[in-house]
């Protein structure tokens, strides 16, 4: 039993180290401007559905309910942008809300599209969780690499401290915005807006 537990701990530590290395490499590419945004057509609803499917298993394993309250007709349309990076942003934020949540908690994803004119629109999505929340002081530094909150319940979770800096950098590259509201012991809400071109074809 002791040997089995030791192997399990070693596997968790190895996975954490691999995640950290991958995040550091990706952040380095962003800072060196070696990441190229796509400009391709994609279906927004399919992208959101794909991201949610990838995260549902992890949520289920942790006893957390992942809900999608998006407006299906609003997001079921073809847009032009960088789907690979938008998907990464959604998955990172969903993973965050799942990781720092409590057994029996919920994570709710909601999205819509707000037309700006005939050619451009805003993809707007919100991720709301019933997790452990964040202190106001930590929120001031959340986009700094390796930012960790070590004096409360978050310290027992193994985060790399790179997820939010990557998310913020990718959103900035696309000319979007992210806002976070959080309350300790209650949960957090992430609101993102990303400008996209409307696919006319």
Where are these regions (language model features)?
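A conserved beta-strand-to-alpha-helix junction within the catalytic ATP-binding
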Residues: 38-53, 87
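Short helix-loop "hinge" at the ATP-lid/N-box region of the Bergerat-fold HATPase_c
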Residues: 97-98
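Short conserved segments within the C-terminal catalytic ATPase subdomain
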Residues: 58-70
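Short conserved segment of the HATPase_c
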Residues: 134-148
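Short alpha-helical segment of the dimerization/phosphotransfer core of two-component systems
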Residues: 12-17
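Helix-loop junction within the histidine kinase core
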Residues: 28-39
């Amino acid at each position: 039993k002791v040997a089995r537990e030791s192997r399990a701990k070693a596997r968790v530590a190895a996975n954490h180290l691999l995640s950290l290395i991958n995040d550091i490499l990706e952040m380095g590419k962003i800072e060196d401007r070696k990441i190229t945004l796509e400009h391709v057509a994609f279906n927004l609803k399919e992208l959101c559905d794909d991201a949610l499917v990838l995260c549902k298993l992890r949520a289920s394993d942790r006893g957390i309910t992942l809900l999608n309250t998006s407006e299906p007709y609003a997001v079921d349309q073809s847009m032009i942008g960088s789907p690979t990076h938008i998907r990464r942003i959604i998955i990172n934020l969903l993973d965050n809300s799942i990781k720092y949540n409590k057994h029996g908690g919920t994570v709710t994803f909601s999205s819509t599209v707000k037309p700006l004119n005939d050619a451009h629109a805003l993809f707007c999505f919100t991720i709301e969780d019933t997790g452990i929340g964040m202190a106001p002081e930590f929120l001031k530094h959340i986009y700094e690499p390796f930012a960790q909150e070590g004096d409360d319940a978050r310290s027992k979770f193994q985060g790399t401290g790179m997820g939010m800096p990557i998310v913020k950098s990718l959103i900035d590259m696309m000319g979007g915005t992210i806002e976070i509201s959080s309350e300790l012991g209650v949960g957090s809400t992430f609101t993102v807006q990303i400008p996209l071109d409307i696919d006319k074809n």
